From Swiss-Prot:
Component of the ribosome, a large ribonucleoprotein complex responsible for the synthesis of proteins in the cell. The small ribosomal subunit (SSU) binds messenger RNAs (mRNAs) and translates the encoded message by selecting cognate aminoacyl-transfer RNA (tRNA) molecules. The large subunit (LSU) contains the ribosomal catalytic site termed the peptidyl transferase center (PTC), which catalyzes the formation of peptide bonds, thereby polymerizing the amino acids delivered by tRNAs into a polypeptide chain. Belongs to the eukaryotic ribosomal protein eL38 family. Disulfide bonds: none annotated. GO terms for molecular function: structural constituent of ribosome. It comes from the Eukaryota. It comes from Candida albicans (strain SC5314 / ATCC MYA-2876) (Yeast). The gene is RPL38. The keyword Signal does not apply. Keywords: Cytoplasm, Ribonucleoprotein, Ribosomal protein. This is Large ribosomal subunit protein eL38.
């Protein structure tokens, strides 16, 4: 089962739980309505029951969030 998280603070709290062992960071190239390219970053963490996903469209926020993930997580970049 999957759950989408909208709040960054809630996602960071989830990532610090004891049952969360791994994270996946996926960067997609997207085009907005004006035809301008941007990078969409998806953060996925696997819990015991759900896979939680956070979608970030701002590259600077995504970089800060990736640095704030706990060092105990096994992070895979796609």
């Amino acid at each position: 089962m999957a759950r989408e998280i909208k709040d960054i603070k809630e996602f960071v709290e989830l990532a610090r739980r004891s049952d969360i062992k791994s994270a996946i960071v996926k960067v997609n190239a997207k085009v907005n309505a004006n035809g301008k390219k941007f990078k969409q970053t998806k953060f996925k963490v696997r819990g015991s029951r759900y896979q939680y996903t956070l979608v970030v469209n701002d590259a600077s926020k995504a970089k800060k969030l990736q640095q704030s993930l706990p060092p105990t997580l096994k992070i895979t970049n796609l």
